[in-house]
Regions:
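Hydrophobic/small residue at the entry helix of a nucleotide-binding pocket
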Residues: 2-3, 96
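Histidine-anchored nucleotide/phosphate-binding helix
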Residues: 3-13
Length: 122
């Protein structure tokens, strides 16, 4: 999330005329890094849409009433209305990034519109 946080902060600070839709997944609610900051930006800057999903809500200490499950092609289709003129940025552990590239491929999103960064070690 850290690279995306920096990109979003820059866009908010400069009030850029660009649309950003962050789809952010964690295992449990307690793992949502920068949650308050992201929510504040989404409320105060109309160009940011924020969707957060939890994959294991039953294991968390905090209740979760939002999206559940992994980010996959079905969830992307549900949340993103139009794939034209969009660039998809993906970062995270290698297996997750690979799964996201496959999901985007199933949606016929060309690899030229997908930017990835794999973080190892977690």
């Amino acid at each position: 999330i850290t690279p995306f946080r920096s990109m979003i902060k820059y866009a908010v600070d400069k009030n850029l005329n660009t649309q950003i839709h962050l789809i952010y997944s964690n295992s449990i609610p307690e793992e949502i890094t920068f949650e308050g900051e992201l929510e504040n930006w989404a409320k105060s800057w109309p160009n940011l849409k924020l969707d957060m999903a939890i994959t294991k809500p039953e294991e968390g200490k905090e209740p979760w009433n939002g999206l559940t499950g992994r980010i996959d092609e079905k969830l992307i289709q549900k949340l993103v209305s139009d794939f034209n003129d969009k660039i998809f940025w993906v970062c995270g552990p290698p297996l997750m990034v690979d799964a996201m590239e496959q999901a985007l491929g199933k949606l016929n999103i060309s690899s030229g519109k997908v930017r990835v960064e794999k973080f190892t070690g977690y």
